[in-house]
From Swiss-Prot:
This is Ribonuclease HII. Manganese or magnesium. Binds 1 divalent metal ion per monomer in the absence of substrate. May bind a second metal ion after substrate binding. NCBIfam families: ribonuclease HII (TIGR00729). A divalent metal cation binds at residues 26-27, 141. It comes from Methanococcus aeolicus (strain ATCC BAA-1280 / DSM 17508 / OCM 812 / Nankai-3).
């Protein structure tokens, strides 16, 4: 299922800590029709692992909003944090050529490689022959149904290739099983939530942005009815958006037909008056 089936999910191995880097990645906002998807990475040094494991960090969904904010500040102030914000228009553009899993994979590898570039400054661009010195463990919440294939895809795009020292552990629910991934999930969730709050100041109450959210549904329906288009923060490639656009297209077609009939009727009336005259 992963590169190291003997890894204890409750407590990552802390042996040889001084020569180890632990990296966790997760996303927030994969499914919403409104707003961005955020990919986050948290990196800790091996010598900090024991203290990190003692922290009350769980999957972001298991913390209250206030607690997530507290943990967010603690994590970014004590550990290496990186993130990628993919706005709706960026997601739509990428969806023209690749699917959502590949978009997520692309963002994961971009963040991981940003770490590797710093850890191995002498790497050669597009080279796969380097050997890493420290042991690097990368934990990822897998978005693909095939965890092993997902891990291999990530590995194939890394700028450092070392089977002995770089381990990729990609699993479903990794955000529940590994604190380092839980930390990344908190970072991603808080950043997305803050973006949604920014949008509300511009667009009014938009809800959570998820298609199942009644407030989001009402907001989108009203916006499209009024403006005959989707807001900039909407993912136009989502089925929810496509259905709303289809309704507008159908309504525009009906309106054009009505206008055409009205014009035709007016012409006929004018012709009738001329004949009578």
């Amino acid at each position: 299922m992963n590169d190291n089936d003997n890894i204890d999910k409750d407590n990552i191995d802390t042996m040889n800590d001084n020569n180890k880097l632990i990296i966790g990645l997760d996303e927030a906002g994969r499914g919403p029709v409104l707003g961005p998807m955020v990919i986050a990475l948290v990196k800790i040094k091996g010598q900090d692992l024991k203290n990190f494991e003692k922290l009350d960090i769980k999957d972001s969904k298991k913390h209250s909003k206030n607690r997530r904010e507290e943990l967010f500040e603690m994590i970014i102030n004590n550990y290496d944090v990186r993130y990628e914000i993919l706005e709706a228009k960026t997601i739509d553009k990428l969806m023209n050529t690749i699917n959502l899993n590949k978009i997520e994979l692309m963002a994961f590898t971009k963040l991981i490689n940003s770490v590797l570039k710093e850890e191995y400054p002498n790497y050669k661009e597009n080279s796969k022959i380097q050997t890493a010195t420290p042991q690097i463990e990368i934990y990822i919440d897998a978005c693909s149904s095939n965890e092993k294939a997902f891990a291999n895809q990530i590995k194939s795009k890394l700028i450092v290739n070392d089977e002995n020292n770089i381990k990729i552990i990609a699993e479903h629910k990794a955000d529940e099983n590994y604190k380092i991934v839980s930390a990344a999930s908190i970072i991603a969730k808080v950043i997305r939530d803050r973006k949604i709050e920014e949008y509300k100041k511009i667009y009014g109450e938009i809800g959570s942005g998820y298609p199942s959210d009644k407030i989001t549904q009402k907001y989108l329906a009203n916006y499209v009815e009024k403006n005959r288009e989707l807001p900039e923060i909407a993912r136009k490639s989502w089925n929810t958006s496509k259905k709303l656009l289809k309704k507008i297209e159908d309504k525009n077609t009906v309106d054009k037909i009505k206008d055409s009939k009205r014009i035709k009727t007016n012409i006929e009336l004018k012709q009738t008056k001329l004949v009578e005259f």
